[in-house]
Every structure is written in C-alpha cells, then in structure tokens.
C-alpha cells in the first residue's frame, strides 16, 4: 500500500494524497474545519458510487454534537456549471439557515469543484471549502490553486474568483469508478506537468504506459446496491490496485508541480501560465470539437502542436517532440485532429484554420491582439519563465498540413550554414534488427526518430526481441538484446504504416519468431499504399526455405501471415534482387540464426542498389558476423551460423539521402552548406550526390572522410548534367530533378537536358516517383521525358520562367503523394519561383500539400528550412475544401440484369441533370461496334472482364467528379479489380447505387429475353454468388419492383427521383420548425396496406416504419417495405426505427449483428430519419453517426417502466449524450404516473432548446404532453390495427385538444370574386379541416369589388384567416397587399391573401404551384434539365405556366398563341432568364433542335382550336418522342374534364395528359398549407372536389 503524502501550497500542507483514506478525510475536515453545518455537494453520478455512500454514512456517524450534515446533489455535466445552478444552491443554503461558519465539501470532478468553490467564495461573502476531487483531471489540475468559476452562454469560466480551499483531499480510490475515457483524458494534464517541469517523472511515465493502458482498458461495468437508496446501479470499475504505485506517483508528482508553480505565482501573472502548455492551441480545438472531444484530448493535440512550434523555432530537438508524441499515443491520447479514431469520435467535424486562430485570440495569456504560447525547451523545462509571443504566420504553418513556400529572396549570397540531418533510416532500421538479435546492451545514438523507426521499435518490443529503454533525455536508445531467444508471436497484427524498410526486414525476422501456447503466427500489415508495394520476391525465397507465409489480401503485398511453427532452414537461398536491395539485407541479417549456414545467391540479373547490401555486410561485421562474398559465383554470399555480439555503443550516421536537400539548397541559392557527419567514408551510396551530381553542375565541393560542404555558383548559373547513372543513390534522383529544372547552358541544341538513369526501382517506392516528378515538374512549367529506367529533365532557360502551379481556377497545390522525398524536393524548387523578381514585386507563394509526410525520415525538415536556412513559410486552409464544393460526384449504377438499370439510369441522369453513359455501349464503341455477346464468344468471359474493368477505371478516373451516371453490366462485380475500383470510388464520396428487385420476378423475365448473352450457369446461382459483392461494393441501394401499369411506373419514377435527390444532397431533408407530427406504422407487412398508407399519413410530416414489427429482417424484405411505402405515400420522409425490447419494442436486445445490418440497409436506402437508441453500445452509435450521410439522426430514449421523473438526472445525462453524439433531433418518451409529470416535462422542454426536442409522456395521463409537443409528435391513425405506444393520439385528436386549450384559433376563410357559385374551394378546404380536426371554416364571399373585400374581410373580420382570390379581383386586390411574393410579382396577379397579423397582408399566387405539382405528381421530374417546355395560349394563366416551367428547370420555353401579336409584350414583361421564345410561324418550329417534353395548355377549353394554332401545336407534340421522360401535357381548364387539346395530345401523339382538376386541387392544397401550416390531405380533397 502507499503512504499518505502531504504537499505544501502557498506555505500550508493542505494537499493530502493517499489511497482509501476515507477515515482520514472525515477526521481532517471535522478536526480542522469545525462548523455547525457541513454541506456535501456532488452530482447524481457520484451518488451511485459505493465509496461515496460509505463516506456520507461515516461523515454522519462522526459528526460532533451540535453539527449537522446536508447533502446537495446537482445534475451531471458542464451544463450544471451555470448561474442558475449557483443560484439554486445559494437559495437552498439560505433556506436551510446556513451561516458564515458553513463548510462546503465539493466531492466530484472539475465541474463540481469549480462551481462549489465559486459558491463558497461568494456565499455570506466567503465560507470555507474543502475540495475532494474524484476525477484524475480534477486531482491534478482543477482542485489545486483556488481557481473557481461558472460558465456563461458567451464562454467557459468567464465569471469566477480565486478562492483557496482549506484542504484538497486526494483519494486515489475514487479513480476505480472513473470511466476509461475520462481516465485517459486526465493523463494529458499529468503528462503536461511532467513535460514542463519534471524530466524524471516523464521518463517514469514512459516506462509505465503499457501497464496503465492494460489496466484502464480492462475496466468492467458492475452492478452495485446503493447503500442510501437500496436501488441497483451500474458503474464502471477499474482495478486500480494493479497499478496503484504508478497511479499514486503520477498523481502525487503532478500535484507537486502544480503546487510549486501556484505557490510562486498564485494570481497567474507569469510563471503560472507555464501550466498552460498545450492549452493555447488545445483550447482552440476544444472550442470547435466540444462536446465530442474532451479537454485532455484537445490539450494532448495542443501539446504536440506547441512542441512542433518550438522545434520550428529551432529550440526543441526533434527527439523531444518524438518522445512527447510517443508518450501521448502510449497513454491512448490523440496527437493530431486527423487521426482516424479521433475523427470518428468527433464526427468528422472540420477545424478551419481561421476559426482556430480566432479562438486562440481569446486567451488570458495574450496581450491585446498579440498571441502568447508556452514554448518547450526540452522535456522537463520551458523556454523562459512565461509564455512567448507568436505570430499568426508561424501558427498557421503549425496548424495545417498545407505549406506556402515564399520565394527565397532575402537569403544572403554569403550565407554559410551547418546542417545535421537526422540519422539514416537505412542504418537505424538495420541497427535495431541487429541489436535486437544480438546479445548484450547496445547504446544507439543519433537514431532517426520517425514513423519508420517508431514502427520498428514497436515491433521489436511487441515480439519481445529485446528490452528497450532511453537515456540522455531520450536522445539515446538502449537496446538490451537477448540473442533472438525470446522472440515470441504476438496476437495483434504489427501495423507498419507505409514503412517499406521495416516491413521487409521484419518479414525475415518473423521467420525466427517462436510460437507461444496461444499464438502460432504473426500478421504484418500497413496502410493502403503499403498494401500495394511489392514483397513477393522475399516471400518466395522464404517460402522456398521452409517458412510458411500467406497473403491476406493482394497477392505479392502486405498484409501477410507468417506461421511461427515453421522453421528457417538455411542452406542455399535464391533471391530475385532487381527490385529492392532491402530483400537481400533482410535475409542477410537473419541468416546467422538459420538452422544451417546460408548461401545467398542473387538471381535474375544485376541486383539493384548493391551499395546498400555492402552497408548491411559492414554493419553485420560491427556486430560480430563476417559475411564472405563468393569468388566463383556472381552476387553470392556465404553467411556462417552464429549470433551477434552487441557493441556497447553504435552511432548512426546521418541520412545521406536527407543530406541531399540542404546541399541542393546551397547549390540552387548560391550559398554554402556543410553536413559535418557524412563524407567519402560513408556506408551510404547517396553520400556521392555532392561529388557525382552537384559538382559537375557547377558547385564547389569540399569533402573529407566525415564531412561534405557544397557552395553553389551564382543563382541561375547551374549547368545541366548530360548523363548520370544514379543506381548507387536512387533515392537522391528526386533532388537531382529539381536542381536540373533550373539548370541551363549556352548550347542551343542541348535543350538544357539532364539525363538520369539507373533508377527503375523508384517506380515502386512510396509512390511511382518517376511519374510523380514528371507530373509535378510540369506544374512549374518544366518539361520531362520518362525513360525505361530513368528520366530526362529539360531545364528552363531562366529561373524567371518558373511558374506558380495553377490551373484555370487559380493556384493549385504541389501533390506529394504521401512521399517524404517528393515533398522535400519540391520545397526547394518552390522557393526558387519568383525568387529573381524585383524586391517590391508581390510574389505568390507555392503551395505544397501533405507536408507532414516528411515525418517518415526528417520530421524537422521544414523547421530547418525555415529557422536554419532562412526560408519564409506560412500555412493555409486546404484547397480541397473549395474545389470539392464544385465537384459533382458521379453515380455508378450496379445490379443484376433486368434490375431496371437502363431505365433508372435515364431517370437518374434526368433528375440530377447529369450526362448518361452506358458502359456496355461504350465497350461496343471501343470494339468496332462488336456486341458484348460476340466479343464473349470470340474472346471468352475473362478477356471481357479485363476490358470491362479497364473501361470502368478509365471513366471513373476521368469523369468521376464531373456529373455522370454510369450504367454498368450486371457482371462488373465478378472482377476483383472492378470491385476494388467500385469500393474506392464509394469511399472517395462517389455514389455506387445497387439497384435490385425480387429475384423470382427477375428470373421469369430473363428466361424470356433472347437479346442478352447466354449464362453459363443458372440465374439464381449467379445471384447467390453476386449478391454479397453488390452489397459490399455499393454505398447506396434502391429496390425497384416490377411495374404492371403506367401509374405504377410513374409513381416509381417519382419515388426514385426524390430518393436520388436526397442521397446526393440536392433535396435537403428539413427538420420541421413548427408544429408537426409523424405517424407510427405497426404493420408486419405493408404489401397489403398500400391503399391505406396515404390516408394514414394525412397531416404528417413523416412516417415511422417500426422495423421491429416487420415479419422478417432480411435486407430484401426491409428494402421492399421501404420501396412500397415511398411509392404509396409519394415519398413522405421515412423515420426508420428498430425499437429494442428494453426500450419498449420487439427487437431482441443483444442482436447487435442484425441491428448493424438493418442500420446499413436504412442508410443505403437513404431514409430521411433514423431513430438511434441512446442505450445502444457506443461503437454502434458512432458507426451510424459517422456513416449517416444526409440522413438525420433522432437520438431516442424511452422510459416504459416510469422509473425516472423528468427532474431525474437520467434525462439530463441522456440529453448531454445526445449532444455529444451530435444527433439532429432528440426524442424522449417518459411515462406519466400523475398529471404533475406533464408539468415537469414542460419545464424540461423549456430548459432544453439547443436541439429540436420531441418529448412526450405515455399513458392517457400523458395525453396533454403530446398536444403540447411541438416538433414531430408521434401519432397514430384510426386505420392502424393498434397504436405504437400507450396514449398515442391521432392528428385530429391533437388538433381538437389544442384548439380547446386556445392553441389554435378558429379562423374564417373565403373564396372572393364573381361568379363563384360553382367554386369548389369551400369543399376543398372544409374537407381538409374536417380530416385534420382543424376548427376553421371556409365560405364564399361573392363580390366584384376589391374595396368591399378590404372593408368587410381584411379590416372588418377579426377572425379572418385568408382568402382565395378569383376573377375579377386577382389584379384589383394587389393594391391592398403590404407584401407580395416573388411569384405574385412575376405572374402579376394574386390568388391567395395571407394575413401577417397587425392588419398586414401578403399577396401570393399558388397557380404556378398547382401546375408544377400536378406535373411532378404525374411523372415529370422535379428538374427537367435539357428538355424544353411549351405553353399554349397567352392569357393570364400562361404567366403562371411560364413561371412553373422555369421552376422545373426548362432551359427554353416556347409559347404559341392564336393571336401572335400578344406574345411579344407578354415575353418582354417576364424575366429574361426564363428564356421564352414566341413562335410566330409554323416553319420556324422545324428548325427547333430541342426535345419538348412538358406542356401547359392555357387556351379556352370550350371552343375548338384555331387551325393555325393546332398546326403549331402538332409540330411541337411530335418533339415529345425523344424526351428523357414520358412527355406530359397539363390542361389548365378544369371544365370540361376532357378538352380538345387533351384528346389530340393523348390519342394522336401518345402524350400523358393531366386534367385541370389536378391543377385546381394542387393549387388549393398549396393555399391550405400556407394558411394552416399543415399539408393538405390531397387524395381525400381531390375525391371530394371531383366526385360530382
């Protein structure tokens, strides 16, 4: 057990630290803080902890006579740290008669400590407070130093006081019940204090990280009985005793630092702001990422960024930054906002640069507008004794991954610099393998601290190859080798990022690893690029030698599984070494440990990079093994059996490839650079770069055995190199290319060409480097020629010819391909652009993308370029954010034959205004119009699949972002390469839409179609094989049933058009802002209910599918249900709900696999809303939230048992959880036990307005809550077999109850005009009012006088609710309107008067909506794109028709009329963007190229058509044949029901015709919604209006 420790602060020993010290805690408070009243304050979460209950009981039992104990419990979470909670607590203290001698005891985390401390500081002008912190963060930070505060709506901690506690009693035992993430969160502050003040403690923390994470990750949830209430609670439990010593020390040491700093600077004037290390930047991230990210997580990122800032200034060494980053990762903290797990946790929120800087400007350390940041000098020490001023330019650089390199203008020609590059990656990785296999201790100095070596160190540790520790503040790594005897298989895959060297060396090392009782293999894996890089020659050799290895993904690349029960035999091993010398080195280093001596023969031609093989052999010699080179056989080596003996010290030479960058900088800028630890004795081939490349180009070179100095010629005088074989130094060719780009000579025939050869292996490095250099040099205006094993660079005649990379839209970035060498090379060329311009000329910088990729070998390169070499750098917001806005991601449609791909692809293109390409047709075009069937007969399926894949990859590469719909062949998923391309496109934001239908129907159809290629096997077998592939490759899915009638076909089209608009974001899903409802369906199968679905949804903004009620949960069945519902209800938004049993539903609680599948179906089907229960496992919640796309998430919680009153913390906790998950709507359903529960609910609703909230009580006692709920109230219908929850009401019942309470005022509405005797408006509106239970009345007011309407209705009727205006008042009424809608202004008439209140009125016109909606309802897409429109007639209605056709996106609208002279004034009176073309002669129609697919007839219907007009009309009707949808004509007149225009259009030209009654009802329903806020029940109204 640990001892109780006392830590002094401000001269008093008041901080006590121990474990299980409850008795000491009670005794200390009672003995040293005597009082008549003790008040324990905590939150409800802590009340569940047994240790807290024990403490309260013990406190009560120990009270002296005359003293009392009060307990006050607040709701958990940051929201409680408010003025309101403070006031409530103060009122409680006053009511309880607390006086000046009161002692407040704050037991809890930072929120409780801060708030109770502030109450204590102001109550009775200050009473005593004792802090008992229960979270790690509170123990080491917020409880110490006397800072107290509450939050305000404008910011955190803005109101507070310094009020020192009487005691801070820290009991480690509280941490047993701390949630895992909170525990890890607190470690950020612990690491911070060690980092700024205590290097020894930092080292101790490093060595205990794995113990900590193992224990914390092992936390379990346990059920406990509450000693105070006897209720059963569930709490987290961590086995603190398993790491008690470590936890105690980390808390104690962290407290000591804070106490010492506070003691010397209580009021935070200087020294105390050192405690803000990591906080300046961390707080800025926190401000954006809260509440998803925790304080410590953001501080962790802030520390790394602020450490990088110090390194950028040349103050902190790269090793120290690497150590800090490594320890944070080891304790489970994020080090970058871009880490995959952290991005998912923070729901992919963006952290824009300008917002970060804005947030940083609100920091108490700042002085005015100048920002200050704590700068670290080394681990354990800050630079200076307070924060330092930092410019926005430097902060921008640190905060982004995109770098702006300004011209190298202010660099003096006589500049001389010494640069020491990091240790060689090649030597570092070899040294780690050799030392791990060797025996004894080896101190490795100047080891490269990079991603590659980090992966290697981790692997050596995981495989138990050696014991690893650090000395010299982390600058020296100490490897205690065990001679290979302890190598053991590890269970977790070894992740190697993009570290090629590590992956190749570890593949051979894996052959030496021993099995354990539970583990017989190890897995090596890496990132996406690593999984493309070759490793086959090495694997082939090892397999041939007895090691069993499997590829787990792509043949020839990682990931691989190496079986540890096979043996590395030795003997003769043959290896192809023309691709990578690392294969050779890998086998060489492990060869001494084979079962017999090894003869390694390199076959297949001259090996690549032989110098690296020589390097390995020389290093093996240093570790005690001598390799012999054969004198009789070329490229053959003999390696004896033995084991390495570790030298006591091994110094890693600097990386010669990295040294090429500062040396090239000298060459290009005419300055001098010395690299002091690489000379002609170097083991590395790249050490020749200065001598063999830069010297012949015109540089002065001084090279000793151990150093190299380069002095460049005057700027602009470098000479091209006619030919250089860079095979001994292939990695340096990229540096040579950028030097060559600015080299030129006086020979007019040379074209300034530098020819580089011997570098074929560079095509399979981190990227295809030869192609990368050619592509990016072209952006600077530099031409290149690719060679079979090299590149020619054609230098520019003058540096002034270098261009800033840009395209038609402005500057573009230089791509680095996640390749460190590409990035560092172009950082040099970027600075030469505009470097020769006049000093005062404004020069645009060059943007380099992904600068962090240099972390692979030289994390501090940018710091050296800036601080040592004098380059001006800046950071910038990524360009992709702006460019992606304009990209229109294409849609790829996949699915079985006969799934409807051809038809639906056309609909898709039409709905989105995209271009359509059928890939089978494209295939035929590319193969001389040979059909797919013929091609397959001649060449076979395999060849066809290859070609199909090639074409698909090509179109995606070229047109994936350009708004295309690609219709594919059914078998595209048969090829693994195509499947990968489909998945890659989907993951890059493209739409891969799986179209499917009932397989039985498909089979019947296919067997009767002779035009398609014959199947080799049965259709059902094909479906069974492909079904999984279709699902795996698609990110969206649409079920398209076979349609037997035109009406069904049109309904399906409407439903698909809305679906595709929703998933692509064209149609935004809106959460209703006013009173609204959704109906809850409880059917087990919707197939038989289609007739009832529309009336069931009357008055609702959405419909809920209770998936848990469905007959089965198969993907096809559920998709079909969604399709039926969409078609039947005209795509009313769907709420997809799977209600679990414990939340009151039918779905089994633990069936998480099926639940995940159902959510996947929902998201692929683009449902508008998805109900996500807040009680589900967090991994499922985050998975759904991160995949939600455009779907809105409803976070729901139901209390069916009535366990929680609305003032219980359960609801507060759940609301905070919903905020953290960033759901779109919160849905809480309680149970009303008594009427008062409704009042408590309303108080909750009133205080939780920062998210749309659905909150209702079940049972009949809770009915009132359903009436008062505003947003999306769940309702039932009389047509449902049963309601989904007790107490559910219908829309009509709710409206009637709301009316009786005064919520809806009865209104009187009228149709005005003359004659109106036959007007259908009263029946139209009154039908709607009756169905929806609205109290309004609609009547006729017949008059020809607008003046009378104003007097009697607008001014004279206090219940006036609106008017439908008809002839002759549509123009006259406008003078009395206070506002006109755009439609009313353009159409020039008002048919709808809307009261605005205060005797003000708005004039609108819904005729155009009547026309538009009637057309859409009859199969016309919402966007008709490339189709033209036609209006027949030029009267008043024609203006509404023109407005409607323009709103549908008609690019041109033609208009014809009996009297052509009326056309010109009509066209001139309308906006020019309507693009209206009046047709005066029949002849001019022949020249029209456009398809005309939509028309509106506005001519009188009671007379025959004029011959001239009829002739024009017929010529237009012919043009409907090639429209992208069924050509449709709407008749604006509703009497007679069939007009001459309708007859000729339908019978002679097969146009679909829409009668005027539909326009009438649609415009009336639009009025209905504008007046009442409710969608009108269209079908019922239509039936009522047209039944006579």
UniProtKB/Swiss-Prot annotation:
Catalytic activity: 7-phospho-2-dehydro-3-deoxy-D-arabino-heptonate = 3-dehydroquinate + phosphate; 3-dehydroquinate = 3-dehydroshikimate + H2O; shikimate + NADP(+) = 3-dehydroshikimate + NADPH + H(+); shikimate + ATP = 3-phosphoshikimate + ADP + H(+)
Pathway: Metabolic intermediate biosynthesis; chorismate biosynthesis; chorismate from D-erythrose 4-phosphate and phosphoenolpyruvate: step 2/7; Metabolic intermediate biosynthesis; chorismate biosynthesis; chorismate from D-erythrose 4-phosphate and phosphoenolpyruvate: step 3/7; Metabolic intermediate biosynthesis; chorismate biosynthesis; chorismate from D-erythrose 4-phosphate and phosphoenolpyruvate: step 4/7; Metabolic intermediate biosynthesis; chorismate biosynthesis; chorismate from D-erythrose 4-phosphate and phosphoenolpyruvate: step 5/7
Main location: cytoplasm
Pfam families per UniProt: DHQ_synthase, DHQS_C, DHquinase_I, EPSP_synthase, SDH_C, Shikimate_DH, Shikimate_dh_N, SKI
Region (3-dehydroquinate synthase), start-end ranges: 1-392
Cofactor binding note from Swiss-Prot or TrEMBL: Binds 2 Zn(2+) ions per subunit.
Transmembrane segments: none
Binding site for ATP: 895-902
Ranges for region Shikimate kinase: 890-1080
Residues that, per the record, bind Zn(2+): 189, 279, 295
PANTHER family, per database record: AROM/DEHYDROQUINATE SYNTHASE, PENTAFUNCTIONAL AROM POLYPEPTIDE
Family assignment from sequence similarity: In the N-terminal section; belongs to the sugar phosphate cyclases superfamily. Dehydroquinate synthase family.
Name of this chain's protein: Pentafunctional AROM polypeptide
